[in-house]
Amino acid sequence: MTLPKDKLFLSEQTWRWYGPDDPVSLWDIKQAGATGIVNALHHIPNGEVWTVEEIMKRKELIESVGLKWSVVESVPVHEHIKTQTGNFRKYIENYKESLRNLGQCGIHIVTYNFMPVLDWTRTDLAYTLPDGSKALRFERAAFIAFDLFLLKRPGAETEYTDEEKTKARIRFEQMDEKEKQLLVRNMIAGLPGSEESFTLEQFQHELDRYRGIDAEKLRTHLIYFLKEITSTADEAGVKLVIHPDDPPCSILGLPRIMSCAEDFQALIDAVPNESNGLCLCTGSLGVSCANDLEGMMRRFGDRINFVHFRSTQRDAEGNFYEANHLEGDVDMYHVMKAFLELQQRRKVSIPMRPDHGHQMVDDLKKKTNPGYSCIGRLRGLAELRGLEMGIAKSIF
């Protein structure tokens, strides 16, 4: 099948930018070849309205270098909404107002997640790979050691096997005080994309809010939230895209409800509004060997409005690290092929971004946001761009 060049739909190449304080500048991003920016107003506290004035100020800054604010990632969902406590109805109304304002300002894709307390979780933010570059890693024994011996979460010991607890004890005894404190910081101290950071005591208090909230109840709260806001999103021309759980399993006793194809299907069935869409993150979902990423791309293609391309290398013990974008356990060729075919079928260029990247080359000497250094993502974007173009040239 041959498509005329002007009829070929390739992805919109985007880049996550953390605003004026990001060490990676808009000019850096432009030189990387991205055309769209993925951004959020991190200076606005969770739950408050994003005003037209604040949105336009940021949009004009992005456009001043010839880039486009393509995707919001994220408008955070307040914890009161997730637990349906306190001022949750007020925060839902504020969320609606933010969606109206974003639509009015011409920004039409809004990412969010419904993960309790934590955004994404890693135990090591500077795992050294054989080539000397650094990646993000999740080590299960260290994670359990944090839960049992540092956080000392009530009832945690019942959630792990005897073998896991023994490995965690050995791992904990190997740590010196500096390593223990680093693990605590890595686990709970506001990673990029997380809007809150906590002391251990505050963190446990936040976990306690979810006592009595299992996966079924949290899903009910998510569906309630979406039924409240999707009509507003429809009217504003905004597509909501939910990010999957990272990692896609229960952690610290917290429920997870966006971890697999069945979770996606349940959400679409419950809230069929056109604005109820998905962010397919191959890195988050790829941690579970049960997730067929190519199949999910094809099955949910009409709902996928944003894609994160990332690969992970996992092992049998539940550990994983973030691999190079074209390596690891994700079959990026077939996922990209399905993505490319989806865009031709829908006749649309869908935003994608290289999700995370290794800290490498010059960035090893710099202070960077974990996972969001420049050169590793530049490499990832170049590889993904080449893969997409190569597939397109070979089949269209």
From Swiss-Prot:
Report the pathway entry.
Carbohydrate metabolism; pentose and glucuronate interconversion
Database matches in Gene3D superfamilies = Divalent-metal-dependent TIM barrel enzymes
The cofactors required by this protein are: Fe(2+); Mn(2+)
Against SUPFAM superfamilies, the record matches this protein to:
Xylose isomerase-like
- The enzyme's main class, written as a single word, is lyase
Output the Gene Ontology terms for molecular function.
Answer: ferrous iron binding; manganese ion binding; mannonate dehydratase activity
Endpoints of the signal sequence: none
Question: InterPro entries, from UniProt?
Answer: Man_deHydtase (IPR004628), Xyl_isomerase-like_sf (IPR036237)
So what does this thing catalyse?
D-mannonate = 2-dehydro-3-deoxy-D-gluconate + H2O
Q: Which GO terms describe its biological process?
A: D-glucuronate catabolic process
Keywords in UniProt for this one? Iron, Lyase, Manganese
PANTHER family tied to this protein: MANNONATE DEHYDRATASE
Record-stated family = Belongs to the mannonate dehydratase family.
Name the UniProt record assigns to this protein: Mannonate dehydratase
